[in-house]
């Protein structure tokens, strides 16, 4: 197995773990905040969606980087 292929796999795998965990924690805490204060649901939901989009951008960037590394290997 080529070490470059291993590096591409690790770049994608490890790069997606962080945003995945972050979005999970963000959703849990946002649901908890809405449960405690239902009047602020709109503001909390807006911030949650914005934060999830930014975190997902990092995951997509990692995925694209892995694809670029993989095509460079071939």
Question: Model-predicted segments: where are they?
Answer:
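Hydrophobic, small-residue-rich transmembrane alpha-helices and their short perimembrane loops
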Residues: 1-74
């Amino acid at each position: 197995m080529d070490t470059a292929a291993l590096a591409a796999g690790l770049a994608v795998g490890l790069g997606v773990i962080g945003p995945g965990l972050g979005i999970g924690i963000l959703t849990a805490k946002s649901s908890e905040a809405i449960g405690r204060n239902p009047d602020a649901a709109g503001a909390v939901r807006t911030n949650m969606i914005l934060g999830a989009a930014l975190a997902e951008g990092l995951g997509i960037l990692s995925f694209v980087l892995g694809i670029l590394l993989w095509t460079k290997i071939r």
